[in-house]
Curated annotation (Swiss-Prot):
Belongs to the FGAMS family. It catalyses: N(2)-formyl-N(1)-(5-phospho-beta-D-ribosyl)glycinamide + L-glutamine + ATP + H2O = 2-formamido-N(1)-(5-O-phospho-beta-D-ribosyl)acetamidine + L-glutamate + ADP + phosphate + H(+). The keyword Membrane does not apply. GO terms for cellular component: cytoplasm. Mg(2+) 1 binds at residues 78, 512. It is an enzyme of class 6 (ligase). CDD domains: PurL_repeat1, PurL_repeat2. It comes from Methanobrevibacter smithii (strain ATCC 35061 / DSM 861 / OCM 144 / PS). Its main location: cytoplasm. The lineage of its organism: Archaea, Methanobacteriati, Methanobacteriota, Methanomada group, Methanobacteria. Signal peptide: none annotated. Monomer. Part of the FGAM synthase complex composed of 1 PurL, 1 PurQ and 2 PurS subunits. Part of the phosphoribosylformylglycinamidine synthase complex involved in the purines biosynthetic pathway. Catalyzes the ATP-dependent conversion of formylglycinamide ribonucleotide (FGAR) and glutamine to yield formylglycinamidine ribonucleotide (FGAM) and glutamate. The FGAM synthase complex is composed of three subunits. PurQ produces an ammonia molecule by converting glutamine to glutamate. PurL transfers the ammonia molecule to FGAR to form FGAM in an ATP-dependent manner. This is Phosphoribosylformylglycinamidine synthase subunit PurL. Substrate binds at residues 79-82, 101, 226, 298-300, 514.
Length: 716
């Protein structure tokens, strides 16, 4: 049990009595950090959550964004970190299953998955094992349920050796008049439990996720990891959507963390009603299960529909058709209590508000002094450093990962993995751009600028594809919130994220907090993994690859002396200190709006490529454009707009925010330049078969040999 003495006293003060074993187990689950957000809730409330395109912000299983007159997107992001550290294949698979159920719970059909993954160094055998089996778990689950995995990111850093991060984003499509919510508004409606049967797996999964891992966790906590079943999930998905299409459903919610306890209590509390649950009606996978085990089980692939009794027969016929189990397990009642019965005997009787709305905590915060010193290094020759940087697993091609994913099932994918963002078709005119991003070194060095930078980079990625950013989702991965310095990092990160989201009118509509990501004193780098959804006219889509010899290369934005905290410093110099790149929000906003305006007015397609500058700086961004297009370029480094005189390596590896590379048809350069009123310079031309950076030349083959096959060699 993880209930503290003060929480026990609070609970018993409200009840006016002692809890029995079942009640204590139910409340232990609901008071866990994972379910209650008791440490983070006061801080999360500072996020901007409303906007003109937002139908629903945080509070339900997913957020909702309007994309056309007819359609909305359901968008969510979840973590499955602790389970994946213990059982990587199953932990990753059940993470996919959970976010898919969240999207289905809004009435939407899942159309895309994205993943944001972090592991220790690939020189470490345990990290390789976790990486291999997490990717396998995501691949097997996503491919078998028929939902494409279209984008994502992977980082390798020693801070994640014992605490890998498995964050998954899902997007679903729903007609606006078919949206449902996680509510139980009508007394007399019944709870129809459908999907998989209830077993002993996952009991106390949420309390396990609300504690630090230890060296014994791999054996002691394995029973808390749920068992994935993608084949049942596919049937549950189709049956759920058919029920929603055929029946007037009052509400629906998936059974994830906290199992039936969490699902039922949140359904009725949202509608200020009560619930009665009859345990004897719940389909069980194992014999001899106790009420405690039944109510706390986190067995996968289960959903609860709130429906009128007259619709039960129709709903169960649909379940039978899809060969999944279903049963009426209770009803919505007057009052505000959740009552658990078994053969007429009341086993638990708890106020729903006590279960679904535990008190938040006002934990201590302690500021960490930021390192603002200038980090001086001896730069190796650019010929050496760029090829070495391209062969770093953090920069190198992630084809080993995404080739295992089916990214074209459902035939909506317009731009595939490997670009700034994935693009999916919604209808003949409308597409959406999707991306996930994080920069854990920046966030470690400066939580505010790191948090702001994560949102800004994700927004630049969708803008580079021609899409207007509509909304943000997140997974906020941190250490122990009981440590004042950790909670200060968390607060400052959210303040930075909020600054950018608010200025771009891209509210935070859904997300997840994962605390306690540390093992015996080893803490992860603070990791705000950010997903952004952008919407665009299909005609505005651009990609990063160089297209035509003779095109002029323009760099929009100013380059600052901001190489500290960069991939260059981490990879080439093994340094992770100094000042992180700062967010200059006015410039970030102006430059982003400039790109969108240029693309919107470019009916002749004179702008042929767009790419943002981020990890690895200008040198890596240009290398990617060369390799993608299989055509070289010549860059005049002296033409780049800078804040001051910079050494060559500081210039090409700076990770200053707010910068975009665009290529323009030579005949249209003057026309395009006349439309730009932010810092811009012609820095080169697309030509030949080499990348020429000042006096440094690289053949396309050299770049490809460094960039491709890196992860494959580690995993061979």
């Amino acid at each position: 049990m993880t209930l503290t003495d003060s929480e026990m006293e609070y609970i018993e003060g409200i009840l006016g009595r002692k809890m029995n074993e079942l009640e204590e187990g139910m409340l232990d689950v609901m008071f866990s950090e994972h379910c209650s957000y008791k440490s983070s809730r006061p801080i999360l409330g500072t996020f901007p959550t409303e906007g003109e395109n937002i139908i629903l912000g945080p509070g339900d299983d997913a957020g909702l964004v309007s994309v056309t007159d007819k359609y909305a997107l359901a968008v969510g992001m979840e973590s499955h970190n602790h389970p994946s550290a213990i059982e990587p294949y199953g932990g990753a698979g059940t993470g996919i299953g959970g976010i898919l159920r969240d999207i289905i719970s809004m009435g939407a059909r899942p159309i895309a998955l994205l993943d944001s993954l972090r592991f220790g160094s690939l020189d470490d055998e345990k990290s390789k094992y976790l990486f291999e089996h997490v990717v396998e778990g995501i691949s097997d689950y996503g491919n078998r349920v028929g939902v494409p995995t279209v984008a994502g990111e992977v980082e390798f850093d020693d801070s994640f050796r014992t605490n890998p991060l498995v964050n998954v984003m899902c997007v679903g499509l729903v007609e606006k008049d078919k949206i449902v919510r996680g509510k139980a508004p009508y007394v007399g409606d019944v709870f129809l439990l459908m999907g998989g049967t209830t077993g002993r797996d996952g009991i106390h999964g949420v309390t396990f996720a609300s504690e630090e891992l230890t060296s014994d966790s791999e054996t002691e906590d394995r029973p808390a990891v749920q068992v994935a079943d993608p084949f049942t999930k596919k049937r549950v998905l189709e049956a759920s959507l058919e029920i929603l299409d055929e029946i007037n459903v009052s509400g629906v919610k998936d059974l994830g963390g906290g199992g039936l306890t969490c699902c039922i209590s949140e359904l009725v509390d949202e509608s200020n009603n009560g619930a009665r649950v009859d345990l004897r009606n719940i389909p069980l996978r194992e014999t001899g299960m106790t009420p405690y085990e039944i109510m706390l089980s986190e067995s996968q692939e289960r959903m609860v529909f709130v429906i009128n009794p007259k619709d039960v027969k129709k709903a169960q016929e649909i379940c039978d058709k899809h060969e999944i189990v279903s049963a009426v397990i209770g009803e919505v009642i007057d009052g505000n209590n959740m009552i658990i019965d078994d053969e007429g005997s009341s086993l638990a009787d708890l106020p729903t508000i006590l279960l679904a709305d535990p008190p938040s905590l006002n934990r201590e915060l302690k500021e960490i002094a930021e390192d603002t010193s200038k980090v001086e290094v001896d730069h190796p020759p650019v010929r050496q450093s760029l090829l070495e940087l391209l062969s770093s697993p953090n920069i190198a091609s992630k084809q080993w990962v995404y080739k295992q994913y089916d990214h074209e099932v459902q035939v909506r994918t317009v731009v595939k993995p490997g670009d700034d963002a994935a693009v999916l078709r919604i209808d003949d005119d409308t597409a959406i751009a999707l991306t996930t991003d994080a920069n854990t070194i920046h966030t470690k060095l400066s939580p505010f600028d790191g948090g702001a930078g994560c949102v800004a980079e994700a927004i630049r990625n969708v803008i580079s594809m021609g899409a207007t950013p509509y909304a943000v989702v997140d997974c906020l991965n941190f250490g122990n919130p009981e440590t004042p310095e950790i909670l200060w990092q968390f607060k400052r990160t959210i303040e930075g994220m909020s600054l950018v989201a608010e200025n771009f009118n891209a509210p935070v509509i859904s997300g997840n907090v994962s605390f306690y990501n540390e093992t015996e004193g080893i803490k992860i780098n603070p990791t705000p993994a950010v997903g952004v959804i952008g919407v665009e006219n299909i005609e505005n889509i651009r990609t990063m690859d160089f297209k035509n010899s003779g095109d002029k290369i323009l760099l929009i934005g100013t380059t600052y002396d901001e190489v500290t905290g960069s991939e260059y410093h981490r990879t080439i110099h093994n340094i992770e200190k100094g000042m992180a790149p700062r967010i200059r929000i006015e410039d970030e906003l102006a430059n982003g709006k400039t790109i969108l305006k240029l693309l919107d007015e470019d009916s002749s397609k004179n702008i042929t490529a767009v790419h943002d500058v981020s990890h690895g700086g200008l040198a890596v961004a240009l290398s990617e454009m060369v390799m993608k297009g299989n055509i070289g370029c010549e860059i005049d480094l002296d033409s780049i707009i800078t804040s001051e005189d910079l050494e060559e390596s500081d210039l090409i590896y700076s990770e200053s925010h707010g910068r975009y590379i665009i290529t323009v048809n030579a005949d249209a350069v003057d026309e395009i330049l006349n439309k730009i009123d932010v810092p811009v310079a012609i820095i080169g031309e697309v030509k030949g078969a080499v990348l020429k950076l000042g006096d440094n030349e690289f053949t396309i083959d050299e770049l490809n040999d460094s960039y491709h096959g890196v992860i494959e060699k580690y995993m061979a």
